[in-house]
Amino acid sequence: MPKNDLLLRSLRGEPIGRFPVWLMRQAGRYMPEYRKIRNRVKNFLELCKNVDLATEISLLPLKILGVDAIIIFSDILVPLEPLGVKVEFVEGEGPKLSWSGKVSDLKKYDPSQNAYVYEIIKRVKEAQDEVPVIGFAGAPFTLLSYLIEGGASKDFKSTKLFMWENPKEYKRLMDILTETVLAYLKEQIKAGADVVQIFDSWVNNLSLEDYGEYVYPYVNYLISELKDFSDTPVIYFFRGSSSFIDLAVDYRADALSVDWSVDIPELFKIYDKGFQGNLEPAVLYASEEVIEEKTLGLLRRIPVKTRYVFNLGHGLAPDMELEKVKYLVDLVKSFPLT
């Protein structure tokens, strides 16, 4: 058990003296220390696979920001490589994926091919016993979107057409990806992850009807299987939160990580659920006065006896100022629960 178990106690609904805080993409390009380490390797994927460097990066936010949890440094796309997908990160362009496009050509997932991820979890836990370690994976639909689009997309037209016009192939691919993510997260839990988070970054492009039909059954199965496997807390992050919240609360997730399209204090009035979030990241471009106003404005409205974790509604951006991120973390940590 980590010395600072605020995150775990909050997710379990136990008494806490203050709200726990960590940030998505808390170890990233906005940190000079990260950039120095990044320059020691040729590309981003190599960095993800270098256990020593990835461990060092994972630990940076604890040392520099004093966050209440460490999320391991990795990427949601790495479990696609064992399926036979070529994954590249092109500087200035982001991820590029290539495969035959035939679902039947995908290999059966072998978790051992992502052994470096599990080793990073072990190393981070060996290096510190201060805070919990969070493992993570991309959700099946978000991974499918990358596969069908060949990378990031503005409109996800190809994904939607594949989903609507090839329902049998869509189901086959989603089944494969769901079992892949399940096996991958089970290995992270076995390696010692104290919490796991599932990132559904692209579902905000779907209608409520399509989310219910094409996403919900797979996420529901995935989270249920994880909860049957272990009592390790599960957090589900999904963009477009206001559209899908009524469905997402039915998941067995310990907390839903939501974007700024919803009002968390209001959610606590309606649902008996844990929530994480949801300060709009753009607030960090503003002055410290605005950061304080927006942050305290949220925290003051959160009921004390609730399962709540402070985070952003999405990840930190590369051009954000480290000092403002530190100011935000200190602000949350200094907010007393009375």
From Swiss-Prot:
Enzymatic class: lyase
NCBIfam families (alphabetical): hemE (TIGR01464)
Organism: Aquifex aeolicus (strain VF5)
Predominant subcellular localization, coarse grouping: cytoplasm
GO annotations of cellular component type: cytosol
Subunit comment: Homodimer.
Reactions performed catalytically: uroporphyrinogen III + 4 H(+) = coproporphyrinogen III + 4 CO2
Protein name per its UniProtKB record: Uroporphyrinogen decarboxylase
Gene name per UniProt: hemE
Transmembrane stretches, start-end: none
Function recorded in the entry: Catalyzes the decarboxylation of four acetate groups of uroporphyrinogen-III to yield coproporphyrinogen-III.
Keyword Ion transport among record annotations: no
